[in-house]
Every structure is written in structure tokens, then in C-alpha cells.
A protein has these predicted regions:
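Flavin (FAD/FMN) cofactor-binding and adjacent substrate-gating region
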Residues: 96, 105-173, 177-179, 183-185, ...
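Conserved Rossmann-like nucleotide-cofactor binding loop
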Residues: 17, 42, 222
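Dinucleotide-binding Rossmann-like beta1-alpha1 core, especially the glycine-rich loop
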Residues: 54-138, 291-293, 297-303
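N-terminal Rossmann-like FAD-binding beta1-loop-alpha1 element of flavoenzymes
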Residues: 7-35
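Active-site lid/adjacent beta-loop-alpha segment flanking the redox-cofactor pocket in flavoenzymes
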Residues: 257-368
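C-terminal catalytic lobe of FAD-dependent flavoproteins
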Residues: 317-432
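Flavin-dependent oxidoreductases
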Residues: 20, 193-195, 204-304
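Glycine-rich FAD pyrophosphate-binding loop
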Residues: 27-50
């Protein structure tokens, strides 16, 4: 079989992570030959699709599970997405402005919210505390049939919502608009990566072979499988977590409404989001449950699943530790029940009523075709879940395992990977141009984004 020409960099995976990297390499480096592989017929068919996520820009201002230090890093990395949307005139195309809030219910949560506002208001000076009088006119549904006192910490007129599929398509088009040799390989699945004696990489797809000097694998749950096939990352395993949503039958809220996080739970608390794919009707969720699939709504590849689970005594110990905690155990069982037809929304409505107390079961419909898979990485040596971005980087090849909300940090992760690839290939990264267009910094201003590992 004839091996095609050598590319400087190959990107495996056409989600928002892969597309943002393509954009960053094409626009801000002197790397000339880049190829991107996407096994489906369009980009962002899986977790970056607006049906598979909450369409949220996670800034750290209303996410109550973020510490102040984590919020500082998240704010800087997420600002790149917001800057791109504004600087490249993508408002109301890929990104949308609206209001958002963190809702506290009951005296204990209100006390916690006030303390959080005091701690975070310097980092996010636009945040406001909203009492019941304000909320009664601003979002009246929050108070209908409400017995407990409430308060919110919110922001008005921010970029809150992003269609990450359209954003991915925008990144692709901006890349193709450069003078670089960009090749997009749709409907082409990479099946194997090997390093050859000359140090270059051979990429075997289901149609042919290619060669590349460097590779970045942004393939969701499959990134770890590619790494382990090459002998890397054997200390990791994957716990595939699925998430589902419920729609209301009409638009009930104008704002994104997040709720206070239970510190014992590793997954996001319920939130309500106006959905850009459904005329801004309210979408509640997500649920979170273990699902024996690597890709939601796609065929099950049993061999890949078994390899990803990588079950041994260390992985089993992590599972046992999770089930030992009664709070997590109840949460897992409840979320599993919420997936059962007809019964599910009877259970889920009680969670949703924390946001809208007057909500009835008849107001909800299961969001068929919505939801995705989030590959949570297990560190077998430490016997714990890695709740954030995991990265393996060796000899010019990078494997990214980025669960939700990695889309928010995609441009920051792309910058980090671009710097690494440029160093490996002895190429140049135009930091000044990137600061001006994406980081929105003045000339020669420093950037603190050097290592965003475990930020998302």
C-alpha cells in the first residue's frame, strides 16, 4: 500500500477540541501541513454536539463546586472562547448572551451563597446578589409555590450559551481560510497509530495509511485506548458516565439557573438551561449514570468497551469506594431510575422542583436523542477518579482525555498543545497575534495560562 505524503501534524478527532487545535495551529504557527481525521460525516457529532451538552460556557462564577483558585484558572481559559466569539463576530451565530445565576434554596444555602459572593466578587465584579423581591419580577417561576426562602448570585448580559458544533465549524472554516495545506478526512476512522524507526508516526485508517511528524489525539473515550495500544497510560482506566436531559413543553426561564453543589457528589448539580436547539425551551439536567457504551446513540463496540474499562483489582477498588459512600450510592441508584421510561420523570421532577417548585410531571418530556457520554478517568495507582482533564504526552504525540466541561477550555488546551507541538517540531508560535486575538492581551503582556491540567 502506498503511504501518502508526510504531514507536520495529524489531529485525530473532529470535536471542538480537535477543531480548536486545528484553528490554533493553522492561524498562529508556521506549521504548514495539517490533517484532521473525523470518523463521522461532520464535525462535532458526539460530545460537542449541542444535543450532547448543556451548551454552557463554564466561567467559574456560578459553578459552586469550584474553589476560588480553580475559578481563577477556569476564568482565564474560558475567556478565550468568549474572546473568539466577540472578536470574530460570532455573537448570535455560535455564542449567545443571556443572564445566569446560582440559586440558593433554604437558609443554609443562602448563608453559603453570601459567603461565596464575598469571596468571589473581586474576581467577578459583574456578579450581583438577587433577593426574592428582585427574582419575583426577573424570574417569577422560581418563586411560584415556593415555601423555602431563596436568593441568587447572578450576572446579566454575559455570553452564557455556545453551540459547540457551530463553533467547531467556525474553527474549521477559519483554518481553511489560511494559506496552509489543510486536509479534512471525514468518514475516515483511524484504527491504529505506530511509531516508526525514523521517529515519524504511521496512521492507519479504514481506507489507507498516512504519516505524520506529530499527532494530537482528541478522540474522547478512545484517546486512552489509542494511548494504551501504544503502551502509554496503562495506569488509567475509563468509567463511562452517561447523561440525559428533560425538556419543559414551553419556555419557562430566560436565564441559566444553576443550583448549589453537594460537596460529596463528583457530578454537577441539576441546572436549567434555555436550549438553543429548541427555541430556548427550558432543558433540565443532566442526570449522571454509568452506561456500558463509549458513544451515546451509536453502536456498541464490545471489545473497545472492555479495553476501556480495563477492569482489575485496582479499578474494582475504586468502584467499591464509590459505593461505600451512602450519598453517592443513593445518587447512582436515583439517576439510574430516572432513565426508566415513564417512571424516570416521576423521580426527576423532584430535583427539577428545586428550581421551579410549581413544575409538574406532565410539564416534562424526556429529551430523546439528547445527552452524551463523559469518559471519567480512573487513576488505578491512586484508586481515585480524575475529575478533570487528563493528558499523556510522549515523543511528539499527545492524548487528551477531556470530560465535561472541556469544551469551555478547548482553546486554552489547544494553545498548550500547540506550544508543545511547536517545541517538538522546532516551529514558531505567534504569541503576540494569539494574545491580541484570543487572549485579548496588550502587546508583551504576560499570560498565566501555562498549565491548565485538572482545571476543567
Amino acid at each position: 500500500m502506498i503511504i501518502n505524503k508526510i504531514f507536520d501534524t495529524a489531529i485525530i478527532g473532529g470535536g471542538v477540541a480537535g477543531c480548536s487545535l486545528l484553528f490554533t495551529l493553522a492561524r498562529y504557527t508556521d506549521i504548514n501541513n495539517i490533517i484532521l481525521f473525523e470518523k463521522y460525516d461532520e464535525v462535532s457529532q458526539l460530545n460537542s454536539n449541542p444535543k450532547a451538552n448543556s451548551q454552557t460556557v463554564h466561567v467559574g462564577d456560578i459553578e459552586s463546586n469550584y474553589t476560588l483558585e480553580k475559578a481563577k484558572k477556569v476564568k482565564e481559559s474560558s475567556s478565550m472562547i468568549k474572546n473568539y466569539i466577540e472578536n470574530f463576530q460570532e455573537i448570535n451565530i455560535t455564542g449567545f448572551k443571556s443572564d445566569k445565576m446560582l440559586l440558593a434554596v433554604g437558609e443554609d444555602e443562602i448563608k453559603e451563597l453570601k459567603a461565596r459572593y464575598t469571596e468571589f466578587k473581586e474576581l467577578y465584579p459583574y456578579l450581583e446578589l438577587w433577593d426574592e423581591k428582585f427574582l419575583a419580577t426577573f424570574e417569577p417561576k422560581l418563586l411560584e409555590n415556593r415555601k423555602e426562602p431563596i436568593m441568587a448570585m447572578g450576572a446579566r448580559g454575559q455570553i452564557t450559551t455556545v453551540d459547540y458544533k457551530k463553533l467547531s465549524e467556525s474553527f474549521i472554516q477559519k483554518s481553511l481560510d489560511t494559506d496552509k495545506n489543510i486536509q479534512m478526512r471525514y468518514n475516515e476512522e483511524v484504527t491504529k497509530i505506530t511509531r516508526e524507526e525514523d521517529g515519524y508516526y504511521k496512521i492507519t485508517s479504514d481506507t489507507t495509511n498516512f504519516r505524520a511528524k506529530s499527532i494530537v489525539v482528541n478522540a474522547g473515550a478512545y484517546s486512552l485506548l489509542f494511548a494504551q495500544d501504544m503502551g502509554y497510560g496503562e495506569e488509567y482506566a475509563t468509567l463511562p458516565i452517561g447523561g440525559s436531559f428533560f425538556f419543559t413543553k414551553e419556555k419557562l426561564l430566560n436565564s441559566k439557573v444553576y443550583t448549589m453543589q453537594n460537596p460529596k457528589l463528583p457530578f454537577a448539580a441539576i441546572h436549567a438551561d434555555p436550549d438553543c436547539t429548541q427555541n430556548w425551551n427550558t432543558r433540565f439536567g443532566p442526570t449522571a449514570f454509568a452506561l456500558p457504551k463509549l458513544e451515546r446513540y451509536h453502536s456498541l463496540h464490545l471489545k473497545d468497551l472492555i479495553n476501556a474499562l480495563n477492569i482489575d483489582k485496582d479499578v474494582t477498588q475504586v468502584y467499591m469506594n464509590l459505593f461505600k459512600d451512602s450519598t453517592i450510592r443513593r445518587y447512582i441508584f436515583k439517576n439510574a431510575i430516572e432513565e426508566i421510561p415513564f417512571i424516570g420523570k416521576e423521580v426527576f421532577v423532584h430535583d427539577a422542583q428545586k428550581v421551579i417548585p410549581s413544575l409538574k410531571v406532565s410539564d416534562l418530556t424526556f429529551a430523546e436523542g439528547y445527552g452524551g457520554m463523559r469518559p471519567q478517568i480512573i487513576d488505578k495507582k491512586k484508586h481515585e477518579l480524575l475529575l478533570g482533564e487528563a493528558k499523556i504526552s510522549k515523543n511528539g504525540i499527545i492524548f487528551n482525555m477531556t470530560p465535561s466541561p472541556g469544551a469551555t477550555s478547548s482553546l486554552a488546551i489547544a494553545m498548550q498543545d500547540t506550544k508543545a507541538i511547536c517545541q517538538y517540531l522546532s516551529k514558531s508560535f505567534d504569541l503576540e497575534k494569539h494574545q491580541r486575538e484570543i487572549q485579548m492581551l496588550e502587546k508583551n503582556a504576560p499570560s498565566s495560562i501555562e498549565d491548565i491540567k485538572n482545571v476543567v
